[in-house]
Each structure stands twice: as C-alpha cells, then as structure tokens.
Amino acid sequence: MAQGYAWFCCASNSSTRFSNATNFSRVRINTCVCTSNSSRVTKSSFANCACNVCLSLASASCPKSLIPCGRESWICCITCSIFFGFSIIASYFLKFHLLYVILLQIKTFFRD
C-alpha cells in the first residue's frame, strides 16, 4: 500500500472507490482517474488518453522490466501524464517553428 495523497491514481474499472484519502489499495492501470479528498472518483479523459499513449509507447519501445515503476503503480500514471504533456508542448512548438520558417521564406521571396 502507498501512503499519502496523490493527484492522479490509476484504478481498474471494477474498483473505483478508495476507503480513505491516505491509504490507497493496490490497483491496476486500466484507466486513469483524478482523485480528490472525497471517496468519489471522477474520470478524466485527458489523463486516460495520456496514460494509454504513454504505456503503448513504453511497451512498444522497451520490455516491461525496463519501465521504471511497472504497470501496477500510480506513479507510472503521473509520469505518463507529464511525459504526454511535454510531448504535446513540443509538437506545438515544432508547428509554430515550421510556420515561422515558412513565413520567413515567403517574406524573403517577396522582398527579392
């Protein structure tokens, strides 16, 4: 059991309630959910998407033994969400950078 409060926790579809806010039972990483201080669990489609993408990339690129915290840990869910967030930011940066380069080329073309 993990002690402490977490923003994200991964839970199976069958078990979506916790007994209290400080003791989390062992759960699988089928779906990602946002937890609050209450015992109710609300699903977040963004977190679910982040976990699914990250886990599919991690399982495709390396064996399960090399994934730092394993598939059963909620820490992996947090790591996946952060990784997915950074990848979204990086993709937007690349899009804007390419747009900037194209606009510079157009400006140079019309100047000449």
Curated annotation (Swiss-Prot):
Lipid bilayer topology: Single-pass membrane protein
Q: Which superkingdom heads the taxonomic lineage of this protein's source? A: Bacteria
Q: Which segments cross the bilayer?
A: 82-104
| Keywords, in A-Z order | Membrane, Transmembrane, Transmembrane helix
The entry's protein name is Uncharacterized protein PM1386
Show the GO cellular component annotation of the record.
membrane
Write out the annotated subcellular location. Membrane
Lineage runs:
Bacteria, Pseudomonadati, Pseudomonadota, Gammaproteobacteria, Pasteurellales
